[in-house]
């Protein structure tokens, strides 16, 4: 009996995990490689009190059909609750969704579904090069990964599914014969980085869930998470301060403590009653490729034979705020998996005819 086609999914963010889950369910042999030590990407979570919470703010909208359908498919519909949220400067409240156990539940169930179906997820694997195999009896691609101890390993697979940043894709595919226009379009994509300070405070900063900060400030948005979902078991009130920057900005290279002091000084100016004694704990998350400022003219989904790209930076949806991108990630993952399955079926038909 012929072994199922092997697929290497590069990246264990939401896009990569959804693709891996659906491919494993369809019978493909799936291996996911992730540079970080934990899954989730921009949905990565941290323990806060007795609960998990996202290091970057996220919520669900009623219009997020693909994401809501995924939750139903995974048996998480009952965890989805809808809340009224007050937005600063808005006349009405917005109805937003959040999971009982946060989006950690979504990531955990996806990981479990992948591994239950024989999929493998490798953490601490940084892809350094992708090359074609020169041996026709071997799988089509060779993926070289650098491990945490600086050693390297080569993985073999029939198909590549890449979910990372556009520029990194160019750097790791020099050995592949890809169209010059495709490479140029990827290098033309520019990104803003993001710094997000997550604080647990004794008292709330505001009753509003979301507030945009105008002008040249160290952060551009305040999200009072617990004003929407309540204090739960976090042990206090959860506040996010989020800002986008170019990596040339001095704040990007500052230490975590320096960034905290800059952010808190501005927060205290807005509300003098806030003191550092009101802060119980805090986390700082830096995201290098957070917000693409532009995208290629064409949505290249398959730059080479057996090589697929599922990166939100390839689509106009990348311009949305990160907390709105989950639905676009799931929708694009669905389309990519459908394309892979269609191509695989076509290859099998051609093989049977020959």
Question: What role is predicted for each listed range?
Answer:
Residues 3-32:
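N-terminal Rossmann-like FAD-binding beta1-loop-alpha1 element of flavoenzymes
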Residues 15, 38, 167:
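Conserved Rossmann-like nucleotide-cofactor binding loop
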Residues 24-47:
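Glycine-rich FAD pyrophosphate-binding loop
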Residues 49-90:
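Dinucleotide-binding Rossmann-like beta1-alpha1 core, especially the glycine-rich loop
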Residues 58-65, 89-113, 252-259:
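Short beta-strand to alpha-helix junction loop
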Residues 115-127:
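A conserved beta-strand/loop element that lines the FAD pocket in flavoprotein oxidoreductases
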């Amino acid at each position: 009996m012929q072994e199922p086609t092997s697929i290497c999914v590069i990246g264990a963010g939401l896009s990569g995990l959804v693709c891996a889950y659906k491919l494993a369910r369809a019978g493909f042999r799936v291996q996911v490689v992730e540079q970080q030590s934990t899954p989730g990407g921009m949905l990565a979570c941290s323990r806060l009190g007795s609960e998990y919470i996202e290091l970057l703010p996220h919520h669900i909208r009623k219009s997020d059909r693909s994401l809501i359908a995924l939750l139903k498919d995974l048996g998480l519909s009952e965890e989805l609750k809808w809340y009224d949220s007050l937005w600063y400067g808005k006349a009405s409240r917005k109805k937003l969704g959040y999971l009982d156990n946060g989006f950690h539940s979504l990531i955990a169930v996806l990981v479990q579904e992948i591994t239950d179906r024989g999929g493998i997820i490798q953490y601490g694997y940084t892809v350094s090069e992708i090359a074609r195999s020169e041996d026709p009896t071997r799988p089509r691609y060779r993926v070289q990964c650098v491990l945490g101890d600086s050693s390297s390993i080569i993985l073999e697979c029939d198909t590549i599914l890449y979910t990372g940043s556009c520029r990194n894709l160019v750097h790791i595919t020099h050995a592949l014969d890809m169209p010059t226009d495709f490479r140029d379009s990827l290098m033309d994509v520019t990104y803003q980085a993001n710094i997000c300070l997550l604080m647990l405070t004794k008292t709330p900063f505001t009753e509003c869930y979301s507030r945009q900060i105008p002008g040249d400030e160290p952060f551009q948005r305040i999200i009072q998470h617990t004003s929407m979902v309540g204090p739960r078991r976090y042990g206090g009130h959860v506040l996010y301060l989020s800002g986008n920057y170019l990596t040339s900005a001095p704040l990007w290279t500052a230490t975590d403590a320096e960034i905290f002091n800059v952010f808190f000084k501005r927060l205290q100016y807005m509300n003098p009653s806030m003191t550092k004694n009101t802060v119980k704990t805090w986390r700082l998350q830096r995201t290098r490729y957070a917000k693409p400022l532009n995208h290629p003219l064409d949505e290249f989904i398959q730059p080479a034979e057996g090589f697929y790209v599922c990166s939100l930076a390839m689509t106009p949806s990348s311009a949305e705020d990160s907390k709105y991108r989950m639905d676009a990630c799931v929708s694009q993952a669905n389309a990519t998996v459908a394309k892979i399955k269609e191509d695989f079926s076509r290859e099998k038909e051609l093989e049977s005819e020959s």
